[in-house]
Amino acid sequence: MSSHPPHVIVLIGPTASGKTELAIEIAEYFKTNIHNIDSRQIYKSMDIGTAKPSKIQQKKIRHFLIDIEEPINPINVKQFQEIAQKSIKEEIKKDKLPFLVGGSGLYMNSITKGFFVPDVPPQNNLRKQLEELGQEKCWDLLENCDPLSTKKINFADHVRTIRALEVFYVTGKPLSTLKVQKPPNWKILELGLDRGNLKERIFQRTKNMFLSGIIDETNHLISKYGFDLPILETIGYREARNVLNNHSTIDKAIELTATKTIQFAKRQKTWFRNKNNPLWLNNKNPLKDAIIKIESFLS
């Protein structure tokens, strides 16, 4: 293995921008694998609602960090950071070109920038109390103790809201005060994918999710883990659950899911521009542009 810092390629972008399809084409060209950096695709049985790469796509190119835990067992950033770094180091040992793809800015930067992540174990009693308060009250608490985190976490994301409160109450420090601890000794190229027609893509993908069976997938998760499974607060699953309990129609669920996803995508784009500043790819031919940039980086 070379004594020089290993090269690592990163592809980031908002949800529904087409990262999965482009990443597979890039991986095929450079004969490498994909490390999926996503806070929801790590869970089993959550395929449709997380837009997980299909079985066919996963057969075409090997994807790491998918389906590594049951939805009942939340994985925090610290745990994901450790699992991902170990997997990436294994690729480097094999002289493979690590290729990281995802839209979860915090998870990605915990790996590429070496963010220090508080090693706070789950506080079951505290979590129970917070669960009883409900998401709206928990959000109010988070706005008071860690307002910066509320700009990075989706209002409906009960899991991450409780985790941020948990870190604050245990350490006395806001989760948003994470600092760079020790960036890995990698030479990193960050590419960004952002589509001009993102709203239309989100609406179309949302319709496809409901046509493809997110309601059945949600029903399966409920039957296996219970109606109050925290991860079901994820955009799309929450709306599908509301259809199942007759609190919403399918049309309303599609509209609300798309609206929330558009809002989430805006926050992702803001994060990437402020925290990452990648080389944004040409929308007309992102594959050609990516290949040119990567080959130049590797030469």
UniProtKB/Swiss-Prot annotation:
InterPro entries: Dimethylallyltransferase, IPT, P-loop_NTPase
Keyword Transferase: yes
Pfam families in UniProt: IPPT (PF01715)
Catalysed reactions, semicolon-separated: adenosine(37) in tRNA + dimethylallyl diphosphate = N(6)-dimethylallyladenosine(37) in tRNA + diphosphate
Binding site for substrate: 15-20
Protein EC: 2.5.1.75
SUPFAM superfamilies according to UniProt: P-loop containing nucleoside triphosphate hydrolases
Binding site for ATP: 13-20
Residue numbers spanned by region Interaction with substrate tRNA: 38-41
Residues carrying the site annotation Interaction with substrate tRNA: 104
Any GO BP annotation: tRNA modification
Gene3D superfamilies from the UniProt entry: 1.10.20.140, P-loop containing nucleotide triphosphate hydrolases (3.40.50.300)
Keyword ATP-binding: yes
Cofactor requirements of the protein: Mg(2+)
Annotated keywords: ATP-binding, Magnesium, Nucleotide-binding, Transferase, tRNA processing
GO molecular function, one term: tRNA dimethylallyltransferase activity
General function of this protein: Catalyzes the transfer of a dimethylallyl group onto the adenine at position 37 in tRNAs that read codons beginning with uridine, leading to the formation of N6-(dimethylallyl)adenosine (i(6)A).
Record NCBIfam families: miaA
Subunit structure as annotated in this protein's UniProt entry: Monomer.
HAMAP family cross-referenced by the UniProt entry: IPP_trans
Family stated for the protein in its record: Belongs to the IPP transferase family.
Name used for this protein in its record: tRNA dimethylallyltransferase
Gene name per UniProt: miaA
